[in-house]
Amino acid sequence: MANTPSAQKAVRKVAARTQVNRARRSRVRTFMRKFDDALAGGDRASAEVAFKNFEPEIMRAVSKGVFHKNAAARKVSRLAKRLKALSV
């Protein structure tokens, strides 16, 4: 338990940031799930739209510190590879 007022405030701030970050991570996962569903359906047009929606969302999360930039780049690269394979 935090004893000093500054430590108590730090605990409150961490809890608030955790909620925001959890929401951002969930939003990114939702966009990723929409992309996966479009791929599973075999619809290239909707998969492209889902990918174009997913990429800026994950990069926005990177800029906010939710994901590491290399982890996000890896996810984007893998999804782009799957999208390209769908068209071949």
Curated annotation (Swiss-Prot):
The keyword RNA-binding applies. Gene3D superfamilies: Ribosomal protein S20. Keywords: Ribonucleoprotein, Ribosomal protein, RNA-binding, rRNA-binding. One of its GO terms (biological process) is translation. One of its GO terms (molecular function) is structural constituent of ribosome. GO terms for cellular component: small ribosomal subunit. Disulfide bonds: none annotated. The keyword Amino-acid biosynthesis does not apply. Belongs to the bacterial ribosomal protein bS20 family. Binds directly to 16S ribosomal RNA. This is Small ribosomal subunit protein bS20. The gene is rpsT.
